[in-house]
Design a protein with these regions (language model features):
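Recognizes extended acidic, P/S/T-rich segments that occur
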Residues: 492-508
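Polysaccharide-binding and catalytic clefts of secreted carbohydrate-active enzymes
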Residues: 112, 183-340, 349-350
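Conserved aromatic anchor
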Residues: 478-490
Length: 508
């Protein structure tokens, strides 16, 4: 083959991310072909309490923008504590290497587990796992964020806003005394149930403090998102004195508590968006609640009001723990409707054949919930259930299908609203004794996620992001080097390479 026929035309498309890693969608068309999803016995899977068949993509559609993430936490032993700069770098480079092999483009990294900080903070005490850190010498979080961005990986800072301890104290998992400004110093700001201690979400000073905590992180570190999971109120909480003081509208217990969490989410959203506007950034606010918002029955199709808010069904076709009511009291649908959050990542951890709350019911409902809204929808994937050898309870349904993750991705992929997925958790993906895990890792590493792509573009910030082409583009054929002028304020660049004669078709 001569040199001419070997030559590849380099088609350079450059996207200005304006301080973000979010790319512009080149092709958002979902595959047309669908087929019925089969149970492990070969019968057609139907939605709970109905004869309606469940469908999935007949073939994976290989999107060009999609969040592909994993949760990583020291609290659940995904990684070990910090002992030295060399140890930390080696440990996290191993994690990032694994993520690269699996085609992942985002890490959800635990930076606040219990009113503590795995970063430099004047508001929260240093976490016990990082007791050996000397920030005057080395800042592990700053290094990690830079290492992620160099690999094209978004960094989502995962915080537990209210949780303080599980040992009855006001300072568990900390390596130093509470700063004087930390409201955990005052027991009147806390709710205690047995040994479990949280901040009282109904106290304005508490809400302001947590907003300040998030903003301190955003202002000092180049994070791409603030991320909360499903910890809000706790089971058995007694906030009688708080309600007596602040429940001026005479709301029910449930309505009062939901309002307190609403006030916090709205305030934080406003602060982040004001910061973004002033600093030309696009830091996101994401929530990963438990999978069920409310329980209900089967409904064929959704209905919406004039503002695009989902009016029916305001519940999924499920039976299980729901976070709207007792005891979490988090009104995530309200946050979606008001577009206070940039993404929702429900923990749709149950298998496709779960009897009470399966994956297919939840992905359908959440896709309905975000429709018409500038809120991205990602699913949390419960690979830990596949990694665990247990066949009891919810775990047994994960053992029905060795290709459970493949079925979940194909089912979710049929919805235009589906923007990606996140595995819980990193250490579970390392459980090579599990055939289910091995199938999932091989699938994403060698096929579905084999080609690394940019994360899903934020629907809220999309209108603010411009596509900017660089100038002075040069290609040195001898050294296969491309050079071009830097585009100011860009996080990164995407380069597409296509064989000669195939311009217009994108190869990854």
């Amino acid at each position: 083959m001569n040199k001419t026929t070997k030559k590849l035309i380099l088609f350079l498309l450059v996207f200005n991310f304006l301080f973000t890693l979010f790319g512009i969608k080149v092709n958002d068309v979902k595959a047309e072909g669908l087929e019925v999803l089969k149970t492990h016995t070969g019968s057609d899977l139907t939605y709970r309490g109905s004869n309606e068949k469940v469908y999935k993509l007949s073939e994976y559609n290989y999107p060009t923008n999609q969040l592909r993430a994993v949760w990583v936490t020291v609290f659940a032993s995904d990684i070990s504590g910090y002992t030295s700069e060399a140890q930390f770098k080696q440990m996290m480079n191993n994690v990032l290497d694994d993520m690269d092999k699996m085609g992942m483009n985002a890490i959800v990294f635990h930076v606040r587990t219990h009113n503590n900080a795995l970063y430099k903070s004047s508001l929260n005490p240093l976490a016990s796992w990082w007791s050996e850190v000397d920030f005057d010498v080395f800042d592990p979080l700053e290094w990690l964020i830079n290492a992620c961005h160099q690999r094209g990986i978004e960094f989502h800072a995962w915080l537990n806003p209210y949780r303080i301890s599980g040992d009855g104290s006001n300072s568990q998992y900390v390596a130093e005394a509470l700063p004087a400004v930390n409201p955990a110093n005052d027991e009147n700001n806390l709710i205690k149930v047995g040994n479990n201690v949280i901040f009282d979400p109904g106290i304005p000073e508490v809400r302001s403090f947590i907003v300040d905590t998030c903003m301190e992180l955003i202002e000092n570190y180049d994070v791409d998102a603030i991320h909360f999971d499903d910890y809000f109120y706790i089971d058995g909480a007694d906030d009688t004195s708080t309600r007596e003081k602040y429940n001026t509208e005479n709301l029910s217990i449930g309505d009062f508590r939901r309002k307190q969490v609403d006030l916090f989410i709205e305030a934080l959203s406003n602060e982040i968006r004001a910061y973004n506007q002033e600093n030309h950034k696009a830091v996101q606010l994401g929530i990963s609640p438990s999978g069920i918002y409310k329980n209900g029955g089967y409904q064929k199709a959704p209905t919406y009001d004039a503002n695009g808010n989902l009016t029916m069904p305001t519940y999924s076709n499920t039976s299980g723990f729901a976070h709207y009511d007792d005891y979490l009291y988090s009104d995530t649908l309200n946050w979606i409707n008001h577009e206070w959050i940039d993404y929702i990542m429900p923990q749709c951890y149950w298998a496709i054949e779960h009897s009470g709350a399966n994956f297919v019911e939840l992905t359908k409902w959440w896709s309905w919930a975000v429709r018409n809204k500038k809120v991205n929808f990602y699913t949390g994937l419960g690979i830990y259930m596949g990694a665990d050898p247990s066949t009891e309870g919810s775990y047994k349904y994960w053992k029905y299908n060795e290709n459970e993750i493949q079925l979940q991705l194909l089912n979710a992929g049929q919805y235009p609203e589906f923007d990606g997925a996140c595995f819980y958790k990193y250490s579970s993906l390392k459980q090579t004794s599990s055939d289910i895990v091995n199938h999932a890792v091989n699938l994403i590493s060698n096929d579905y996620w084999a080609k690394k792509i940019p994360g899903a573009i934020s629907k809220y910030y999309a209108p603010l992001l411009d596509e900017v082409a660089p100038t002075m583009i040069n290609y040195d054929e001898q050294t296969s080097t491309i050079s071009f002028n830097e585009v100011e304020n860009s996080r990164g660049y995407i380069i597409y390479k296509v064989p000669k004669g195939t311009i217009g078709r994108c190869f990854w």
